């Protein structure tokens, strides 16, 4: 097991972060605050430590659910890497980061729409199609600059390159992304070959938004706009052989995942559950 997804202690740490987050937004987004506050208050485990059942809220801003989603994606992406390497011997994985300029919160929603349209134009270009890529995985990440208060949306993409295929240089990718985004001021894209190691898989298994970016309180008044901007955005998008690998391995859409562990192959479920004690800030077992 590459990552420990069953640590009750880790759940408790993330739960504590979730309580702090919920307190901050309780006046600007009471419904979201309530969901995050009561997330993960009941957890059923197997005797070998797997999470068999839990009342996770599945909210993108919930630290507990973001952590669970991230570690499950890590394990799934690792299996996808292995499936693709076996299916297409000699293929390479290239990690591509596509950026845009930072925007204030009131422009974030329109910028995400523009980025989606830019990506479609990018992948429909004739010269892009001529690369003969086997598939890709595109992940959206949004970070917040604590000094300027601006938001930085960007795409992390893993391209699957067939054996013996030549790829253009960095300047070509930058020019194509500038044209697709219709913004000549974009000055940075990142392109590098990855090997399917732990560190490379982590890059495409990140949180959409990091709870560490919301440690202060300056962002609180912006939260309703941020929540609205991300409400109907697809953050995880596989294509080609990557989509095929997820189907073959039986993985579901990350936004629809129950976030519990797969206990269908065995593992006796304990005859008690852990309930969160808000006074002790800990999970206590009850029969």
Please tell me what each predicted stretch does:
Residues 1-151, 161-287:
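Right-hand nucleic-acid polymerase module
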Residues 157:
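Cys/His-coordinated zinc-finger cores
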């Amino acid at each position: 097991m590459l990552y420990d997804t069953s640590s009750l202690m880790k759940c408790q740490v993330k739960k504590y972060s979730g309580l702090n987050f919920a307190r901050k937004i309780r006046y600007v987004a009471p419904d979201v605050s309530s969901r995050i506050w009561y997330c993960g208050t009941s957890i059923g485990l197997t005797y070998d430590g797997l999470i068999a059942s839990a009342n996770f809220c599945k909210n993108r801003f919930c630290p507990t659910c973001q952590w669970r989603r991230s570690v499950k994606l890590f394990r799934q992406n690792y299996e996808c890497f292995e499936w693709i390497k076996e299916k297409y011997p000699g293929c390479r994985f290239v990690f591509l980061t596509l950026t845009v300029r930072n925007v204030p919160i009131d422009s974030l929603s329109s910028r995400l729409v523009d980025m989606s349209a830019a990506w479609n134009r990018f992948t429909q270009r004739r010269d892009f199609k001529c690369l003969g890529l086997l598939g890709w995985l595109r992940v959206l990440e949004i970070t917040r600059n604590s000094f300027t208060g601006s938001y930085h949306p960007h795409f992390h993409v893993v391209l699957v390159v067939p054996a013996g295929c030549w790829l253009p240089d960095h300047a070509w990718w930058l020019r194509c992304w500038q044209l697709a985004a219709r913004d000549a001021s974009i000055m940075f894209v990142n392109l590098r070959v990855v090997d399917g190691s732990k560190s490379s898989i982590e890059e495409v298994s990140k949180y959409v938004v990091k709870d560490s970016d919301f440690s202060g309180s300056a962002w609180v008044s912006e939260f309703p706009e941020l929540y609205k901007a991300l409400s109907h955005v697809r953050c995880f998008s596989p294509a080609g052989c990557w989509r095929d690998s997820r189907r073959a391995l039986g993985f579901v859409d990350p936004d629809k995942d129950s976030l519990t562990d797969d206990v269908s192959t065995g593992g006796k479920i304990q005859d008690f559950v852990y309930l969160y004690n808000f006074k002790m800030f800990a999970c206590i077992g009850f029969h």
